[in-house]
Design a protein with these regions (language model features):
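A short alpha/beta connector and helix-capping loop motif
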Residues: 180-198
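Intrinsically disordered, low-complexity regions enriched in acidic/Ser/Thr/Pro/Gln residues
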Residues: 1-85
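Extracellular/luminal Protease-associated
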Residues: 80-125
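Structural motif
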Residues: 29-31, 52-55, 89-92, 119-123, ...
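Conserved small/polar residues in nucleotide/adenosyl-binding loops
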Residues: 207-213
């Protein structure tokens, strides 16, 4: 399956359905491959974020150790990185202050910038702010909400990250909505459409079950 068809197909489903499809592919239930805590969203939308991970790390609890010039350079490198060689980039940012995050990288300005760069959306364990002022065309799925940006700054790019128990590597296929996020290893991507079809058919069959039938299952 080509990338465009993969994105189109998986965008029709919510993230719990995607998790169920992975269970079908694996032939068993799993305790890995998805976020382990509740998340908040910038937009009240059920449309999922679907694409391939562009990763970074941030910190806000203390001032950066680098010079302002170095900080500006890494910010420019970040913008260049997230738009390079990927049609469907999803920005995934780990706040290394977690679980004591104090500064929001995601607010009115960064949402507008990332929307302008054609990023598909953001998943982070960090903070979100400027509610009510965020561009309606861009979704951020975050760990929590806070009022300040504190000393927030980028520390690493293109690196493995951990978002609420979900390990994500650069280039991983990611699917996220108001329920949280999950990833699908590349070796299983071709199996997704059939697995999703089986999940949907099984769900439909459940709607016809009577209580006595359920008790016998």
């Amino acid at each position: 399956m080509n990338t465009d068809q993969l994105i189109k197909t998986t965008s029709k489903y919510d993230t719990p359905t995607m998790c169920n499809a992975m269970d079908v592919i694996l032939g068993t239930r799993s305790a890995v491959g998805f976020t382990k805590s509740s998340m908040v969203t910038a937009q009240n939308s059920t449309q999922p974020i679907v694409g391939f991970a562009k990763t970074a790390k941030i910190r806000a609890s203390s001032p950066p150790l680098k010079s302002q010039k170095e900080i500006n350079n890494i910010r420019m490198e970040y913008y260049e990185y997230i738009v390079k060689n990927e049609k469907n980039p999803v920005v995934v940012v780990e706040d290394t202050d977690f679980p004591n995050c104090i500064g929001a990288f995601w607010g009115e300005l960064n949402v507008a910038v990332h929307k302008g760069l054609k990023i598909k959306g953001t998943v982070t364990n960090g903070l979100l702010r400027d509610l009510g002022m965020l561009d309606s065309g861009y979704q951020v799925i975050a760990g929590s909400i806070g009022p300040s940006h504190a000393f927030v700054h980028l520390t690493e790019l293109d690196t493995p990250v951990n978002i609420l128990g979900l390990e994500i590597k650069p280039g991983d296929f990611i699917h996220a909505d108001q329920h949280g996020a999950m990833t699908v290893p590349k070796k299983y991507l071709d199996a997704l459409p059939h697995a999703l079809d089986l999940v949907v058919k099984k769900a439909v069959s459940y709607t016809h079950l009577t209580l006595p039938t359920i008790l016998r299952v």
